[in-house]
Amino acid sequence: MNIKPLGERVVIKKLEAEEKTKSGIVLTGTAKERPQEAEVVAVGPGAVVDGNRVAMEVKVGDKVLYSKYAGTEVKVDGEEYTILKQDDILAIVE
């Protein structure tokens, strides 16, 4: 992958949705909840505010939760990624 996000943008790769519910029900492709957990694969340099660059809060390798309909989906070398603003990331999963 060779995507270099600009500004305060982040490239994420979605983690797979659960195949089964906690009670053991197997979900089909259309019944699965759209995943909101992803791994950060690239991070931009950060926004410039009043002439100063603001450091990014996420880093490559972080697992994050993000807004359900945030970002733009792109396909590179057969892999699907989402490019979104750091503000669309809700939390880092530790």
UniProtKB/Swiss-Prot annotation:
PROSITE patterns: CHAPERONINS_CPN10 (PS00681). GO terms for biological process: chaperone cofactor-dependent protein refolding. The gene is groES. PANTHER family: 10 KDA HEAT SHOCK PROTEIN, CO-CHAPERONIN GROES. Together with the chaperonin GroEL, plays an essential role in assisting protein folding. The GroEL-GroES system forms a nano-cage that allows encapsulation of the non-native substrate proteins and provides a physical environment optimized to promote and accelerate protein folding. GroES binds to the apical surface of the GroEL ring, thereby capping the opening of the GroEL channel. Heptamer of 7 subunits arranged in a ring. Interacts with the chaperonin GroEL. It comes from Clostridium beijerinckii (strain ATCC 51743 / NCIMB 8052). Belongs to the GroES chaperonin family. Gene3D superfamilies: GroES chaperonin. This is Co-chaperonin GroES.
